[in-house]
C-alpha cells in the first residue's frame, strides 16, 4: 500500500547566481545552501522535489509575475538527472520545452495525489524511486513515499530504503512515466472537442475504459492492462487518445519565443523587455535582431538587455482527423485500459431443448432455446445442409436416398452463438415400402414390388402398342397409295435409265468374254486344272449366311450380367501373420504382426479383417467403419497474417530548428526516427521513414524562408491483435474419417490422409491409399484460422515469402507474437501497401491493404467453392474438409500395419441356431441390402455368413438377438442358400426376398453425397435388363418364356373379349335404331 505523505518544499531565496555569457545555454543558477525556514503552500500527497525551469518560454515573465516567490529555481544536477520511462525519451533533448513538472510550476497543469482507484502502470523499475508521476486519461497523478522509504520494484508499496535521505530529493529518485511536452494551448469549443472524442472512439473501438474512465460502451471487458498511446490535452475533462496524427512546429515573433536578460545579472525588467520587442533598444542574436531590429548603439552595450531565441522547435500544432489544435500538452505514455472481450462461440454441447423429428425424405430440427443459424445433417453417406432463422427447420436429403434404419448426426449453430452436436435415429421406408406410386418411373424399375399391378400394366402396354402398330400400318398404307400417284413419273424415268444401263453393261461383258475365250483356247489344260480346284473349294464353302441373331441374346446376357463387390467387405487374414500360445481359461493369446490390405468401402459401411487360427473354433474381426471420404488440404509452410491497419505520421520543422539545420539531414534513412517520434511508435515495428522539403517563411510559421523539413513515417500496426494462421495448400488429397474397432472391442476415431500412416494405436496403424483428384479453382486456396476464436475460412493467398498485393498474405510473419506487433525482424511486407502523399505542412497516407477479416467473412466455413462444399471438422490437424457436390468416384484401399496387436481366441465352441427372417434394401446400389438374422448363441463370438453373392462377419452376443448385417447383391429376386459359421458351429440358412433398384441420388437444395469409391457400386439410371426380367417374370429363361407367352395369351383373350363385347354393343344399338 502506498503511504500518502505531506511534505514541504525546501526553498531558498530566488537569487540567480549566473546567467552565463552571451550565446551560452541559459541555466538558472542555484545557491548551495538551503533555507528550511521558508515554506510555500504544497499539495497533499506531493513529495519533496525540485524542478528545473531553464530556457522556458515565459520564464522571465513568470519570475517577474511571481516576484514575491522565495524559492529555489532550477535543480542542482539539471533535468537529465531525472529518470524517464521509456528510457531515452526525446523531450529532454529540447531544453526549451516544458516537462509536466515545469508546466505545473507555470500553472498550466495540476498534478494531484493518486487515489485508491488510480493504478500505477507495469513496466518501469520503481525500486529506489521516491516520487513517480504519470499522465492519466483525466489528469496527472503522483505517487510518493515518506522519508527513508522508496517504492518497491513493482511500485505497489513503499519499503524502507536506508540510502534515501530526507530533504532535497535527488533527480535520479524522481521518475516520469511517459513523454510529455506542454505549452500554453488554445482552448477548443465543445463541438470540436466532441468531434475529437468521436474520432478517438473510432480509432480505439475495442477499448472500453482508460484509467477507469469510459471511452466506449462494452458488454464485456477485460481486466486493466497497459496500453501505450499518444494523446493531447486540450484543457477539457479528459485527454484525447490518438493513433494516426500529424504534428508541425511553428515559430512566432512574440515574447514567448525569446528570453531577455542582462549578462551576469538576471532577467530584464518588464519595461526593458517591451522596449526590446517594440523599439529594438537592446542587442541580441541574429534571429532576434532580424525580427525586432537592434539599434547599432546597443550592439556594443554589453550591460544592456540581450534577447535570444529559445532553442526549441517552436509551438506544436497537432492535426488529428483533419482538425488542427494547439494543445496544452502533447504526449505518449502508458495508461491502463480495459479491452472489449468478444463473446467466443460457445463450446460444442448437447443442444438443450433441441430434438429431432423424422419426416419423409429427411428430418426436422426443433430448437426451443434459440433460432437455428445453420446446420449440417448426415445420414449414411448422404449429407444435407440448411440455413435456418426459425426454431423449426426441415432438412431434406436426396430423393429416395434414405431407406431403413439410419443414424443421424447433426452439427450446427444457433443464433445466440452456441454450437451443438447430437445424434438421432430415424427409420425410413425400406425396400418396396419406399415405393408408393403407381405407373411411375419407380414402378417400371421395380415390378417385383407390384405383384398384381405389373400384369395389368403389361396388358395395357401391349394393347396400346398393338393399337399404335395398327394405326401406324394404316398410315403407311395411306402414304403408299398417295405415293403411287405422286412418284409414278419418277419411277418410269428411273426404270428407263436402269434398262439402258443394263444393255450397256451386257455389250461390254460380251466383248470381255470373247477376249477371254481366245486366251483360254491356248491354255486349255491349265484352265481345266483351275476348274477342278474351284470345284473343290466350293465343296468346303459356307452353306449359308451366319445367323448372327442367334448369338446376340447370349452376348447381351454376358455384357449385362455384372457381379458387384460387397458393400461390407470381408478379408481373411493370413494365418502366418498370427502367432499364438496357450493361456489360462481355455484361451489362446495371439500376437499379430504384418500388413494387410482392406478394400475401400463407402461412408457408413464397414470393412472387416477376419482372424482365425487352425484348431480354434473362435474368430475375431478388426473393423474399419468409414464415416466420410473427403478432400483435405495438404499444407505447405504456414505463416501468420495480422489484421493490419495503415498508419502514418509526420512532423514539420522550420529551417534551423532541431534536425532541420540545413534541410533534410543525410543520415535520415528509411529506418530512421525523428526525435518527435522517439517513443510514440515501436522502433521494432514494420515501417518506412523519409524526409522531404516543406514550405518555409513567415506564411508557414517559420523565421527562415528556406524550405522546412517534413519528416514522415508510414507503418502498419495491428490494433485489434487479431492474427490469422494461413496455410497454403500444396494440393488437395483424399482423406477418410474412420472408426477403428479392434478385436478386443476398443474403438478409436482416426483420420488417415492419403499416403500418411496414422499414429500406432494398440499395435495398429492405418494408411489410406486414395487416388488423386483434381478440381478446377482449388489450386490457390489456403486454409485460414483465426487464432483467437478458431474461425476458419478458405481463400486465395500468397505463397510463403511472396508478399504480393491483392491477396491474403501481403504481410507475412513467422510467429503469432510477431504478427500481433508486426515486428520488422519477424515479418515481411510490400512497402507499396501504404502510400504517402506529401502536402504543404504534412504528409497523408492511403492504404492498399487487403482486409483479412473481410476476406475471411466472405469465405467463412461452411462455404461452397468450385462445386465443393467445405465444412469444419472436430478432429485432426487439418480442420477443413471438402465434399464435392457432384457425385465423385475415387479409388482407394486401406493398408493396415500390425506391430504386435494382441488377440485372444477362445478354444470353446459356441452353439448357434437361428434363421434369416427378412432381407430388404436395394441391389446394385451404394447402400446395399440389410439381412435380418435371428440367432441364439451360447456365448459371445463372431458370426460369419457366406452366401453365393457376398459374405460378411458380425459380432454375436450370448442369448437370443436379431442382427442386421449388410450384404451386396446384384439381382432383384434373392433365393440363395447361405452358410453361417458361429463360433465353430456351422449351419445352413435359406435367404429369400426381393430387393429394389435404387437410382443415382437426385439432388435437392443444400443436399450432397459424400465422396465414394468407384469399386463399390453406386446405382445407375436404369436397371440391368436381366435383373428387370427376373423381377418381372422370375429367375430363369423358362420363366421368362412362360411369362411372355402368358402375357400374350392374356392380351389375345382380352382382345377377343373386347371385340366381342364391342360387336355386341354395336349390334344392339343397330337393332334399337331399326325398331325406333
Curated annotation (Swiss-Prot):
Residues 1-18 form the signal peptide. Changing residue 864 to I: In strain: Isolate Human/United States/2/2009. It comes from the Viruses. Pfam families: Phlebo_G2_C, Phlebovirus_G1, Phlebovirus_G2. The record marks 1074 as: Important for glycoprotein C and glycoprotein N subcellular location. Disulfide bonds join 28-51, 145-158, 182-329, 208-218, 260-307, 289-294, 351-354, 358-426, 378-383, 567-608, 580-590, 633-729, 648-845, 654-702, 660-709, 664-691, 695-700, 782-797, 813-827, 912-982, 922-925. GO terms for cellular component: host cell endoplasmic reticulum membrane; host cell Golgi membrane; membrane; virion membrane. Changing residue 493 to V: In strain: Isolate Human/United States/2/2009. Changing residue 197 to I: In strain: Isolate Human/United States/2/2009. Residues 544-566 are annotated as: Internal signal sequence for glycoprotein C. The record marks 103-104, 566-567 as: Cleavage. Residues 19-455, 567-1040 are lumenal. Glycans are attached at residues 857, 918, 940. The keyword Disulfide bond applies. GO terms for biological process: fusion of virus membrane with host endosome membrane; symbiont entry into host cell; virion attachment to host cell. Residues 654-660, 695-709 are annotated as: Fusion loop. Residues 477-523 are annotated as: Golgi retention signal. InterPro entries: Phlebo_G2_C, Phlebovirus_G1, Phlebovirus_G2_fusion. Keywords: Disulfide bond, Fusion of virus membrane with host endosomal membrane, Fusion of virus membrane with host membrane, Glycoprotein, Host endoplasmic reticulum, Host Golgi apparatus, Host membrane, Host-virus interaction, Lipoprotein, Membrane, Palmitate, Signal, Transmembrane, Transmembrane helix, Viral attachment to host cell, Viral penetration into host cytoplasm, Virion, Virus entry into host cell. The chain crosses the membrane at residues 456-476, 1041-1061. Belongs to the phlebovirus envelope glycoprotein family. This is Envelopment polyprotein. It comes from Heartland virus.
